[in-house]
Amino acid sequence: MSRLRIYDDTRPESPLLDTQDGAIIAAELQKIGVTFERWQATAPVAPGASQEEVFAAYRADIDRLVAERGFKSVDVASIAPDNPNRAELRRKFLDEHFHKEDEVRFFVAGSGLFTLHVGDKVYEIECVKDDLIAVPDGTTHWFDMGDEPSFVAIRFFTEPDGWVGHFTGTDIAQKFPRYVPTQAS
């Protein structure tokens, strides 16, 4: 189940809010310009599935979003717990960074933790299968897939180059707990 925890950015041990209610998650994130929606992942795909398999399963949804929002590039992050490069892949996203475009992800399997740093608050969003999240450009954040990553997310970009992170150089991400999934997705 999706989960949102909100913290003061100096108090990682004490959440100000901890909820699994989808309506509350969406409302709290909307306050900071983040879109959170529950969709239906209609085609079964397993973590580790190829980009081609995921594209084939979700072609209609991908085409619709590209047409509606003007995305120029789409790819798939699909990582299974037995991936030999999982530790390296995890490290790539663990430090605070931002993008010069919205970060839009649709989770079609598994789960991962987006952590946003907005003002003096930290928002941890556990995204699971059926979650769509759109983080506005310029929002500082990090992503943790856990020690044994198990997820498939379709990633949408307005820039043709795809994922380009601009790292802030702060250590805030190290001050917050690492991701341990609350459910098997």
From Swiss-Prot:
- Protein name as annotated: Acireductone dioxygenase
> Its Enzyme Commission number?
1.13.11.54, 1.13.11.53
Instruction: Report the GO molecular function annotations.
Output: acireductone dioxygenase (Ni2+-requiring) activity; acireductone dioxygenase [iron(II)-requiring] activity; iron ion binding; nickel cation binding
Q: Does the keyword Disulfide bond apply?
A: no
Gene designation: mtnD
- According to UniProt, residues marked as the site described as May play a role in transmitting local conformational changes are D102
InterPro entries (alphabetical): ARD, ARD_bac, RmlC-like_jellyroll, RmlC_Cupin_sf
* Major enzyme class: oxidoreductase
Binding annotation for Fe(2+): H97, H99, E103, H141
Cofactor(s) in the UniProt record: Fe(2+); Ni(2+)
Q: Where is this site: May play a role in metal incorporation in vivo?
A: E96
Q: Which residues cross the membrane?
A: none
Q: Which reactions does this protein catalyse?
A: 1,2-dihydroxy-5-(methylsulfanyl)pent-1-en-3-one + O2 = 3-(methylsulfanyl)propanoate + CO + formate + 2 H(+); 1,2-dihydroxy-5-(methylsulfanyl)pent-1-en-3-one + O2 = 4-methylsulfanyl-2-oxobutanoate + formate + 2 H(+)
Which organism is this entry from? Stenotrophomonas maltophilia (strain R551-3)
Alphabetized UniProt keyword annotations: Amino-acid biosynthesis, Dioxygenase, Iron, Metal-binding, Methionine biosynthesis, Nickel, Oxidoreductase
Classification lineage: Bacteria, Pseudomonadati, Pseudomonadota, Gammaproteobacteria, Lysobacterales
